């Protein structure tokens, strides 16, 4: 998988201090794109997705990765970065460029990636991410009307019982 190094990352939102998506105070980066795979597989409209409003209510914008990393590092409250909101692995080059830049600045805080994919569907990006320390990935599609589950790796309650997180490095 040949990846280019990106200077910007396209996001639909940035929350400087998030206390919901991980057991540590985090910067939450709302990724910009989704292929609605979860919805297509079970035959429901994308509007039924818990994240659909993110697409319809917020505009995607390119943000310089280096300045975003500096912004994170200047916040003494946060100790992790969480990618989520839509599908981060549709922006693999940008996510990897962010991780590479953050690690290059000497920061080894946890980076958490919420994906609707299963490990076998994103094996190449996972292989590349394993080169960096402290990467956590939440796997599994959103299933409406599913019982949620507490995930001990993330330290939070997930929306669907088929979802789980793994520390991959």
Predicted regions and their residues:
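N-terminal "domain-start" segment that seeds a small globular fold
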Residues: 1-15, 137
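Canonical Radical SAM [4Fe-4S] cluster-binding loop centered on the CxxxCxxC motif
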Residues: 6-9, 17-62
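A cross-family glycoside hydrolase active-site/sugar-binding cleft signature
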Residues: 30, 84, 112-116, 140
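Canonical radical SAM enzyme core domain
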Residues: 54-69, 89-131
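Conserved glycine-rich "GG(E/T)P / GGGxP" loop and the immediately following alpha-helix
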Residues: 77-102, 143-155, 167
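Non-cysteine beta-strand/loop elements that form the S-adenosyl-L-methionine
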Residues: 133-144
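Charged phosphate-binding loop/patch that engages nucleotide di/tri-phosphates or the phosphate backbone
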Residues: 161-169
């Amino acid at each position: 998988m040949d990846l280019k190094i990106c200077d910007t990352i396209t996001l639909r939102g940035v929350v400087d201090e998030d206390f919901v998506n991980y057991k540590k105070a985090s910067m939450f980066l709302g990724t910009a794109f989704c292929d609605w795979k979860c919805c297509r597989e079970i035959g429901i409209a994308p509007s039924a997705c818990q994240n659909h409003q993110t697409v319809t209510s917020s505009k995607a914008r390119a943000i310089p990765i280096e300045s975003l990393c500096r912004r994170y590092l200047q916040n003494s409250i946060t100790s992790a970065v969480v990618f989520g909101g839509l599908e981060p692995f549709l922006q693999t080059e940008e996510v990897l460029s962010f991780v590479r830049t953050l690690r290059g600045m000497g920061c080894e805080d946890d980076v958490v990636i919420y994906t609707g994919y299963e490990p076998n569907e994103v094996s190449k990006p996972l292989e590349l991410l394993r080169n960096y320390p402290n990467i956590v990935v939440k796997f599994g599609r959103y299933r409406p009307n599913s019982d949620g589950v507490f995930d001990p790796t993330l330290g939070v309650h997930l929306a669907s019982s088929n979802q789980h997180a793994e520390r991959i490095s």
